[in-house]
Amino acid sequence: MTSPMTSKDSKLTLAEKVWRDHVVSQGEGDQPDLIFIDLQLLHEVTSPQAFDGLRMAGRTLRHPELHLATEDHNVPTEGIHNGSLLEINDLVSRTQVETLRKNCEEFGVRLHAMGDKKQGIVHQVGPQLGATQPGMTIVCGDSHTSTHGAFGAMAFGIGTSEVEHVMATQTLSLKPFKTMAINVTGELQPGVTAKDLILAVIATIGTGGGQGHVIEYRGEAIEKLSMEARMTVCNMSIEAGARAGMIAPDETTFDYIKGREMAPTGQDWDDAVAYWKTLPTDEGAEFDTEITIDGSAITPFITWGTNPGQGLPLSSVVPSPEDFPGDNEKVAAEKALAYMGLTPGTPLRDIAIDTVFLGSCTNARMDDLRIAADILRGRSIADSVRMMVVPSSTMIKEQAEAEGLDKIFIEAGAQWRTAGCSMCLGMNPDQLTPGERCASTSNRNFEGRQGPGGRTHLVSPAVAAATAIKGTLASPADLD
């Protein structure tokens, strides 16, 4: 999109409206706009250099109250009692966490550390506190910042130099993104989740299909999703190559935010909702690209390869390189099959799994835990499988325990852990060993993502739970 016009007669998309309302200075010609940033989220991995840059330049944070930090990437998910640094065995991880604590204290940034009830994965902490709100611009040194777009926010990941720039100025210099509408018609079938939906979208448009765009997810199937399910969809927009993903705010959004710690109250709440209701895309507004997908045709979906676009319905077989039209795709398939140790023609349901990981900023919220617990209730996981359940935040962990979900997981034979990024990425003790095959509710299945030589299949919480019981990739329907 070009910089949105402010004329009342203009027909604007959701993304264009949010952009318009944050332009501090509009660039001339091909020059970027200067955009105000409402909220910057921080964690221990991508913030140290930014804080150092401020310190070396003798600067302070321009708006410390518009920053929110938590510890998530490097924290262990077992053996945590009081949040002491001594509970982190790895020296590099411990140093990064310690550095974040010192930086937040020095620069006046609100931090939720290990052992804090409000600690968790950064993309859960913002929503659960009510800090994430419609119409905001939100950034973080993390690609899955797109999660917050589920609330109608313009949320995207940035690099460390940009993190420092936001700290110093609370602005970013950016050219407007292109806009894409993905219309998901119909209703999702029973047993089909938001994770199946977004994996199907990525398989349809490819990992570069959304490059340079903000994707707005629209249609009946999207409107009927819960807030947590919407977060799952927007979370993986980056895996489709997009800069951000957004869903228009509605009553579902407002109901989720209302009453949370950082949400507006009283007249401020009424004023906020009145503004939020102006944000949905105008009738007649034009997107740079539009795609329509039949939501009712989506079935349980998984990945077979080493990028999120290499996915198929669970009912399929492992593809052959010859199934792909282009030479580059054939080579990519050959490489993926070799790394994953798969033989073309093998039914996906016959693939044996060693580990099941239910966690990450994609799928470790209450909806996800309830779905998995309902499937595991009264059942046991296969003897050949280890299952780790890692809630997305300490608040989610406590809520799940209040509902008795932890007991269901433990009685089924799963490990119930404390909050953190965990096995989503190989930056903490939770890792796969070489050749170990995992059904994971996370967002990336790159080579070595979950540990050197580890093999990852991206799945929904429902498929994860069924797979843990069967010992092979499975959906709940396979348990009947």
Curated annotation (Swiss-Prot):
Q: Which GO terms describe its molecular function?
A: 3-isopropylmalate dehydratase activity; 4 iron, 4 sulfur cluster binding; metal ion binding
What pathway or pathways are given for this protein in its record?
Answer: Amino-acid biosynthesis; L-leucine biosynthesis; L-leucine from 3-methyl-2-oxobutanoate: step 2/4
Cross-referenced NCBIfam families: leuC, PRK05478.1, PRK12466.1
Q: Which UniProt keywords apply?
A: 4Fe-4S, Amino-acid biosynthesis, Branched-chain amino acid biosynthesis, Iron, Iron-sulfur, Leucine biosynthesis, Lyase, Metal-binding
**What family does the entry list?**
Belongs to the aconitase/IPM isomerase family. LeuC type 1 subfamily.
| Pfam families found in the cross-reference section | Aconitase
- Domain of life the protein comes from: Bacteria
Protein name in the entry: 3-isopropylmalate dehydratase large subunit
Keyword presence, 4Fe-4S: yes
For binding [4Fe-4S] cluster, which residues are annotated in this chain's numbering? 361, 421, 424
EC top class, as a word: lyase
Q: Which reaction does it catalyse?
A: (2R,3S)-3-isopropylmalate = (2S)-2-isopropylmalate
| E.C. no | 4.2.1.33
Instruction: Supply the source organism for this entry.
Output: Corynebacterium diphtheriae (strain ATCC 700971 / NCTC 13129 / Biotype gravis)
GO annotation, biological process: L-leucine biosynthetic process
Q: How is the cofactor bound?
A: Binds 1 [4Fe-4S] cluster per subunit.
Which proteins does it associate with, and in what oligomeric form?
Answer: Heterodimer of LeuC and LeuD.
Cofactor(s), by name: [4Fe-4S] cluster
Is-annotated flag, keyword Transcription regulation?
Answer: no
UniProt function note: Catalyzes the isomerization between 2-isopropylmalate and 3-isopropylmalate, via the formation of 2-isopropylmaleate.
PANTHER family xref list: 3-ISOPROPYLMALATE DEHYDRATASE (PTHR43822:SF9), HOMOACONITASE, MITOCHONDRIAL-RELATED (PTHR43822)
